[in-house]
Amino acid sequence: MTAFGVEPYGQPKYLEIAGKRMAYIDEGKGDAIVFQHGNPTSSYLWRNIMPHLEGLGRLVACDLIGMGASDKLSPSGPDRYSYGEQRDFLFALWDTLDLGDHVVLVLHDWGSALGFDWANQHRDRVQGIAFMEAIVTPMTWADWPPAVRGVFQGFRSPQGEPMALEHNIFVERVLPGAILRQLSDEEMNHYRRPFVNGGEDRRPTLSWPRNLPIDGEPAEVVALVNEYRSWLEETDMPKLFINAEPGAIITGRIRDYVRSWPNQTEITVPGVHFVQEDSPEEIGAAIAQFVRQLRSAAGV
């Protein structure tokens, strides 16, 4: 039976980016293996996966701006924490961390859009990409599971503010609802901590669903996703697709599409969306094997 550790992995470190303090984990030595979370999580999501990669490289996991232990933006409002603003902060942090030229990316949720985008811009610096429950193509509402479609349509309406900023729906309902097991109180409190204060401190959890590329909107995010997916569907960059069963956002036609990408290995693990909380051992072992194969092929 899988043991689900509750303690964070590693020791948090901090760097100032554009006047704001950003938190990250940076453990071990060697070529970088970069783990990137999405909404509404943090580097805490990777706590039971990163130990499987010890000894295989430098393990880096950053908290997005306004999330985890990173600072909040001020003043805040509906125009803050857009994809573009999140990207500017994260890419500046990655640049400051000097990740080197043999990066392996491990991506989930919005961390996948950010990582795919970065990889597309730095193709000669990425050795391979592992991804799960990722944003791989623009979507339509028909692609969304009926059980959550209404909630996400609500986030993208004027009701989004009370849903997310007052009632903390993304943390209190969406997160636990997309995990097969029940998180402990201690685990939930780690995820609650960045958003314990109501109002604008919770803005990132609302801006992210409003940035999802659904039915052609927002146009700039749709264009960006089309740009990186056009590259991913033709590049021989080694890929590891960690398929979730039953899954949430990579299902049906989108799963079929992802399976067309070249030079890709696939494993299937139990999970809905936050698969790291249901299958950390299987995911960690698969990524470790993937990295060993990449390093061996590169003669490292």
From Swiss-Prot:
Q: Which UniProt keywords apply?
A: Hydrolase
Coiled-coil spans in chain: none
Known Gene3D superfamilies for this protein? alpha/beta hydrolase
E.C. code: 3.8.1.5
Pfam families, per the entry: Abhydrolase_1
- What does the record give under GO molecular function? haloalkane dehalogenase activity
Q: What class of enzyme is it?
A: hydrolase
Transmembrane regions = none
The positions flagged as active site in the entry are: 109, 133, 273
Q: Which InterPro entries does this UniProt record tie to the protein?
A: AB_hydrolase_1, AB_hydrolase_fold, Epox_hydrolase-like, Haloalkane_dehalogenase_2
The protein's annotated catalytic reaction(s) are: 1-haloalkane + H2O = a halide anion + a primary alcohol + H(+)
Every copy of the AB hydrolase-1 domain together lies at 32-155
What is this protein's function per UniProt?
A: Catalyzes hydrolytic cleavage of carbon-halogen bonds in halogenated aliphatic compounds, leading to the formation of the corresponding primary alcohols, halide ions and protons.
User: What binding partners and quaternary form does the record give?
Assistant: Monomer.
Q: Which PANTHER family match?
A: EPOXIDE HYDROLASE (PTHR43329)
Q: Which family does it belong to?
A: Belongs to the haloalkane dehalogenase family. Type 2 subfamily.
Query: Which NCBIfam families does this UniProt record tie to the protein?
Result: PRK03592.1
Identification of the protein by name: Haloalkane dehalogenase
Q: From which source organism is this entry?
A: Mycobacterium bovis (strain ATCC BAA-935 / AF2122/97)
